[in-house]
Amino acid sequence: MKEVLLESREDKQQVYLPEKCIGCGTCVQICPKGELVIGSVGAVARRLIDKDFIEKRKSGACVFCALCARACPTGALEVRKAGTAEKDDSYLSVALQTTIVNEMCVHCGLCVEVCPQGCIEIKDRRLGEDGSLKMSGRTLIDLNACVHCGWCAAVCPSGAISFQKPFAGEFSRDDNVCQACRTCVHTCPANALFNKEWGPGEIVEKVSHRKDACIYCGACAQACPVRAISVRKIAIIPEMKGKKAFEKKLSDPAPWPTLTSLLKTDEDACLGCGNCVIACPVNAFSDPYLAAGHLNELDDKPLLEVLNGTMKVVNQEVCGSCATCAMICPAEAVWLERREVK
């Protein structure tokens, strides 16, 4: 598994495991020194920028308190002493009940189909040889990838799977602000957000929420380029040391993500079609007329514009780092690159 050494001091190391990170920003929310930075969550989740969710400032203010590692629901941060990670019941990822498959499992494979992380597999599955109408095999869960969403337990026909969620919380989304860019849908680690199918003339909400699947991590709110989503953690579910103090700190609204990307364009490749200008959720939020596709009737656009047949970046600083422009461009003429964290 990939490891990123964020900082080393004397015999202590702060290590980031990006493959376990879900981009929720809980570590950023709880850091008392503001040393950790999260940004470009949508672009990272969509694999449209070469960077990780989390970075660290180089101010030297970190006191190695390990609050970030203790609050992380997936164990993506570690504080090591002499090379050994600290792990006890003051760490949420340790206190969290392991997702377990018991002997009642019939190896049907439904859990494999619905797991949003693809972390379940069935090995050696075959018809039973004891004369019964049963399947034999081994159902295995990659605990490094499990996000404790509960999909597997919900669909299991024999009640063979037990799990525990990290947080209880509240989710809200402003339909008037949401631009249906689907960044949140692509980012959610638990497949708790989706777009309903609709028929001709039918009106449905832009994004729907599966309450029972949500782990209230807040990754969707971190990814939303127009800040239409709010997630509040109201309780930590597992029993862990220092639980009340963590709950108090995490009940505060999470800080907005830092802009850690730059929009880059290739003027020679650009077709001037304007797809990026219309699809950009920041542009669309500025004027519904623009969102409806009226590209040329509006003179002022906040982020992207087509001038003289070529796409131009109007203001880098208002970008939501969702990479919707890069997704829709037919000529790969716009992309995101990492911006250095100050």
Which residues are covered by each model-predicted region?
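Ferredoxin-like iron-sulfur electron-transfer modules
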Residues: 3-23, 41-64, 83-107, 124-148, ...
